[in-house]
From Swiss-Prot:
<dbReference type="GO" id="GO:0003735">
    <property type="term" value="F:structural constituent of ribosome"/>
</dbReference>
<dbReference type="InterPro" id="IPR002942">
    <property type="entry name" value="S4_RNA-bd"/>
</dbReference>
<dbReference type="InterPro" id="IPR036986">
    <property type="entry name" value="S4_RNA-bd_sf"/>
</dbReference>
<keyword id="KW-0694">RNA-binding</keyword>
<comment type="function">
    <text>With S5 and S12 plays an important role in translational accuracy.</text>
</comment>
<dbReference type="InterPro" id="IPR001912">
    <property type="entry name" value="Ribosomal_uS4_N"/>
</dbReference>
<comment type="function">
    <text>One of the primary rRNA binding proteins, it binds directly to 16S rRNA where it nucleates assembly of the body of the 30S subunit.</text>
</comment>
<feature type="domain" description="S4 RNA-binding">
    <location>
        <begin position="94"/>
        <end position="157"/>
    </location>
</feature>
<dbReference type="GO" id="GO:0019843">
    <property type="term" value="F:rRNA binding"/>
</dbReference>
<dbReference type="GO" id="GO:0015935">
    <property type="term" value="C:small ribosomal subunit"/>
</dbReference>
<dbReference type="GO" id="GO:0042274">
    <property type="term" value="P:ribosomal small subunit biogenesis"/>
</dbReference>
<keyword id="KW-0699">rRNA-binding</keyword>
<dbReference type="InterPro" id="IPR005709">
    <property type="entry name" value="Ribosomal_uS4_bac-type"/>
</dbReference>
<comment type="subunit">
    <text>Part of the 30S ribosomal subunit. Contacts protein S5. The interaction surface between S4 and S5 is involved in control of translational fidelity.</text>
</comment>
<feature type="region of interest" description="Disordered">
    <location>
        <begin position="18"/>
        <end position="49"/>
    </location>
</feature>
<keyword id="KW-0687">Ribonucleoprotein</keyword>
<dbReference type="Pfam" id="PF01479">
    <property type="entry name" value="S4"/>
</dbReference>
């Protein structure tokens, strides 16, 4: 197992859940946390602990984004009209790395970040190398022609474990994806339950 996979699956073990729905996740075989004390019985979490866990799980799902970036998304979510929890999810799903992953251009959220950093993605015909770039409705995301035969892309095309959500119009032949609308929480194909309202409570306390 590579160091990247070890770090990724450490999040799974800490949460005690297979948060990306991957077949090779270690929690498919055991349900305790990482480290020598991982097998100790865990007591009931306090309200604070439950909220913190919800935040860690959602942050981890989006390739363990930094606290600074995550808090900035929370602040923006609370300033928008409507439900702040729904807004939080909608903003996270507008990240370029999330869309590259959802479109199945790459096999993992971590790979999406690396793929974008290395300049393999264009938005509306222009190269964008910022994973947190905020995609707008109607934007077209594509894999650069020179990058379409990379192993990561070919691997992702063969994955049967996740479907492309309805808020993306994807052409796998051309390796393009159009962002058609901002999704609600119920439309996002999380393999495990996410609780954005607990995250809003965590930061609001």
């Amino acid at each position: 197992m590579t160091k990247r996979n070890e770090a990724k699956y450490k999040i799974d073990r800490r949460m005690g859940q297979n948060i990306w729905g991957r077949p090779k996740s270690p929690v498919n075989k055991r349900e305790y946390g990482p480290g020598q004390h991982g097998q100790r019985r865990k007591g009931k979490l306090s309200d604070f602990g439950t909220q913190l866990r919800a935040k860690q799980k959602l942050k981890g799902y989006y390739a363990n984004i930094s606290e600074r970036q995550f808090y900035a998304v929370y602040v923006e979510a609370t300033r928008l009209k409507g439900d702040s929890g729904e807004n939080l999810i909608g903003l996270l799903e507008r990240r370029l790395d999330a869309i590259v992953y959802r479109a199945k251009f790459v096999p993992t959220m971590f790979a999406a970040r690396q793929f974008i950093n290395h300049g393999h993605i264009k938005v509306n015909g222009k190269r964008v190398n910022i994973p947190s770039y905020k995609v707008k409705v109607g934007d077209v995301i594509e894999v650069k022609d020179a990058s379409k035969q990379l192993a990561l892309v070919l691997e992702a095309n063969q994955l049967a474990e996740r479907d492309v959500p309805d808020f993306l119009d994807v052409d796998h032949g051309k390796q393009t994806a159009k962002f058609t609308r901002i999704p609600s929480l119920s439309e996002v194909p999380f393999p495990v339950q996410m609780e954005p309202h607990l995250i809003i409570e965590f930061y609001s306390r």
